């Protein structure tokens, strides 16, 4: 057992290193986008902490998979220190406690801390009242989120878990036995239901932003941006044209006659357009003379290579997701069981790759980290291109060094929910890996064969799957926690199809769109001239 404990400690040590790397990444990421003029300590700490907690939770997934895989030898037998079911349960409970803690913190962030900080700054902007009144109003609005959280916990604690279906009773027994491993605690069910509800919202965010970002980001890297010099020449022509239109309207009142309401309205619009064009000219002049713009020309081939790599990775994900969903559609136990699969019938590339990588520790750790970071960057690309919307109303724009505290909190909330959904996405891409890792078991063949001694049964080494004997394979806590309620799994299944459709639509749209402006997102009609100081000084 001492040897096993030492080796298991390696997995947790790497988790600790990842934790530090995650904190550093979140700090750099948030500081990159926050407005330096409107920077607030509380909003910055809240954004960094909430995003870090989500990423740390996702980092538990490879630890969980490593632990269940490490308990078994390559020949399908349990290692000496893991032969006791009690020992295996204790090891897995350490992961479960980790999930308990981190998911509880996520609920606290989503339903209390982030809403409170958001409404506090909204009150700070809208009113000139005292700080006490701002805090009181923020708590008043936050109480609605606390009520929603309480309802989710109550529903989760008492929601029926029985699977009603006319499928084969043997399959039903296997499904029920899987989830009995996690226990029947009402507290655990309540937490699982609440987190699954948030993961459902994360699925909608992933369909909206990540699916589009997976196609937009690589194609933007491949196509590049327009030339700053030629773009500035076009902008100068537009400025001259608008100035001529303004002069024509102003010439009507040279003799002292007042302008008509129609002319006044047209003059106002032209002056606003002229103001925006002049701001664009200042930004284009800066980019035209900027050293970084010249460096981008040199590294352009590398951007094209990265773009090609990203689009290949995106296609790999989509193909794997399609094959996994198709496998569920053809061979699963049905919608009433959450489309659980008994064995892998249609093998996808990622489901084959991850168990192989796990044999050389920590390659699977690195690969899972790359997948999570890929989802983060593509989600960010989608959010930057689209902005944060509520139905048809755009709430906030996300721009480097110019994002307001409220928008930053919204951004980190969306990314937190998307990262929560990442665990299920990885399961969809590699179901066998997420459920059992690289575990194998010995299957006793019922047929007998004659030997010199007599008749004997043959043992076959098989990969663990949902049809394996209960005492031969250990299911990860991640899978059981996120799939305790079968109806969420069914919704996730249809969400995966929606994800594929949105990706294809986004790919077509991105291919049809031309090159982006070199100052894309830097200048908007509703920006003030003072906002230029966020980007760079024009002295």
From Swiss-Prot:
GO terms for biological process: insulin receptor internalization; protein localization to lysosome. Residues 29-47, 120-142, 208-303, 384-406, 506-539 are cytoplasmic. One of its GO terms (molecular function) is cobalamin binding. One of its GO terms (cellular component) is lysosomal membrane. Glycans are attached at residues 75, 85, 168, 345, 445-446, 455. It is a multi-pass membrane protein. Its main location: endoplasmic reticulum. It is found in: Endoplasmic reticulum membrane; Lysosome membrane; Cell membrane. It comes from the Eukaryota. The chain crosses the membrane at residues 8-28, 48-68, 99-119, 143-163, 187-207, 304-324, 363-383, 407-427, 485-505. Keywords: Cell membrane, Cobalamin, Cobalt, Endoplasmic reticulum, Glycoprotein, Lysosome, Membrane, Transmembrane, Transmembrane helix, Transport. Residues 1-7, 69-98, 164-186, 325-362, 428-484 are extracellular. Belongs to the LIMR family. LMBRD1 subfamily. Lysosomal membrane chaperone required to export cobalamin (vitamin B12) from the lysosome to the cytosol, allowing its conversion to cofactors. Targets ABCD4 transporter from the endoplasmic reticulum to the lysosome. Then forms a complex with lysosomal ABCD4 and cytoplasmic MMACHC to transport cobalamin across the lysosomal membrane. May play a role in mediating and regulating the internalization of the insulin receptor. This is Lysosomal cobalamin transport escort protein LMBD1. The lineage of its organism: Eukaryota, Metazoa, Chordata, Craniata, Vertebrata. The gene is lmbrd1.
